[in-house]
Amino acid sequence: MTELKQLILIGPLLAFAHAASAQDAFKSEQVKSGSEIYARHCAACHGPRMADPEGAPDLRKFPRDQRERFLTSVSKGKNSMPPWGDLLKPDEIEALWAYVTTGGN
């Protein structure tokens, strides 16, 4: 089998495995907490369950390898996004990261 065929066949499996491992890396309570925080503070701009954001980045597409960038953006704000560091505790921002990383599941 050529490398291209192998990649076509194996690629979706690897993507699924990556998503599953990201979800396993976070405790379900942390993801649930992140979901609640997201609904309260983020959904108005980023859309319910991160879908159809109005003028804000689509967080479903946020690079999963840029955790520090996410934490800093939420804490200190960026562009038109206000800073949330005074309102949210670090563990709450981490819970948001868990929620975003698991794709809202």
Predicted regions and their residues:
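Post-cleavage N-terminal segment of exported redox proteins
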Residues: M1-Q30, S73, L87, Y99-N105
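Generic anion/oxyanion-binding catalytic loop in active/binding sites
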Residues: G11, Q23, G34, L59, ...
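Intrinsically disordered, low-complexity segments enriched in small/polar residues
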Residues: L14-F16, E36, E68, W97
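Gly/Gly-Pro-rich "capping" loops immediately C-terminal to redox-active cysteine motifs
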Residues: S28-E36, G47-K78
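Residues immediately within or flanking Cys/His clusters that coordinate Zn2+
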Residues: A39
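Short cysteine clusters
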Residues: C42-C45
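Axial heme c-ligation environment in periplasmic c-type cytochrome domains
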Residues: P53-R60, S75-N105
